[in-house]
Design a protein with these regions (language model features):
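Onset and early core of a folded interaction/catalytic domain in large eukaryotic regulators
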Residues: 1-94, 168
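Conserved ankyrin/ankyrin-like repeat signature
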Residues: 13, 48-49, 81-82, 126, ...
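Ankyrin repeat domain, specifically the short helix-to-loop turn at the C-terminus of the second helix
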Residues: 16-25, 51-59, 84-102, 133, ...
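Ankyrin-repeat boundary/linker signal
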Residues: 30, 63, 95, 104-107, ...
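Start-of-repeat signature of ankyrin repeats
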Residues: 34, 67, 111, 170-171, ...
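C-terminal interaction modules of eukaryotic adaptor/scaffold proteins
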Residues: 213-217, 221-255
């Protein structure tokens, strides 16, 4: 019943039930998808209840059947308020044991950190926004979601999430993910964060390809020219070859 109260935003009932479940050592009981009441509250976008459950002693490290922690879920859905829960302290992030935790490479989840999840979700929204059939209301809704995800990304980075983390399956960093979808706004953000730091960041390989290889292969309507120039301006090496012995220039679409 605690899961139901949390999902419906019934704060008073949730808190009372949580205190009772804590006494029974069942505060982190899981439902059929492996979600604890805390994970249900995060998914239901109930920041006040998230705060209450954590204060009551809910396990912030708990994961569901897909290996998703509260941070992974909040980042994926773009729930900035959940990440900001609490007035001056971001409770979930302050206990940042999950900032660098990877989703297990099972069931199609290629080992993503919460930051990877947020970037991929932002990319997906960009693809939706490019659809020509959207109404003005739909475009506004997507823009709002996009801004919330950007806020989540900034929060994660500000509190210690590493832009250098690679996913388990493909070895990609957030740089590769932003480039492959032509996400120029996030690309600029990550490149500026890296300025004068790691010389290898821009030239790291994923499946043998650098970000510049990926940028060169982009269609021209995905900011290809601007992204290539940005990468070059930040130290991308056009002479690096991939596993097929191709340099980035060889990856460009014909014509």
């Amino acid at each position: 019943i605690l899961h139901i109260y949390a999902a419906k935003g019934m704060r008073t009932y949730t808190l009372a039930a949580a205190e009772r479940m804590k006494l029974l050592r069942r505060l982190d009981a899981k439902e059929h998808r492996g979600k604890t009441p805390l994970l249900v509250a995060v998914t239901a976008r109930q920041p006040a209840i998230v705060y209450d459950l954590i204060q009551t002693g809910a396990d912030v490290n708990a994961v569901d059947n897909k290996g998703q922690s509260a941070l992974h879920l909040a980042a994926t859905y773009g729930y900035a308020q959940v990440l900001q829960v609490g007035q001056t302290s971001m409770v979930l992030i302050a206990r940042n044991v999950n900032l660098h935790r990877y989703l297990p490479p099972l069931l199609g989840f290629p080992g993503h950190t919460p930051l990877h999840c947020a970037v991929l979700a932002h990319n997906a929204l960009l693809r939706e926004q490019a659809c020509q059939m959207l109404t003005e209301e739909q475009q506004e809704s997507l823009q709002h979601q996009s801004e919330e995800l950007e806020c989540c990304i900034h929060l994660l980075v500000q509190t210690g999430a590493s832009i250098y983390s690679r996913d388990v399956k493909s070895n990609k960093t957030v740089l590769h993910y932003t480039v492959q979808d032509g996400n120029i706004s996030l690309l600029r953000y990550f490149l500026e964060l890296n300025a004068f730091k790691s010389k290898d960041f821009v030239n790291n390989k994923a499946h043998g390809n650098t970000a510049l290889h990926m940028a060169a292969a982009l269609p021209r309507d995905k900011n290809q020219k601007e992204i290539v120039q940005l990468l070059l301006d930040h130290g991308a090496d056009p002479s690096i070859r991939n596993l097929d012995n191709d340099q980035p220039i060889h990856m460009a679409p014909s014509g």
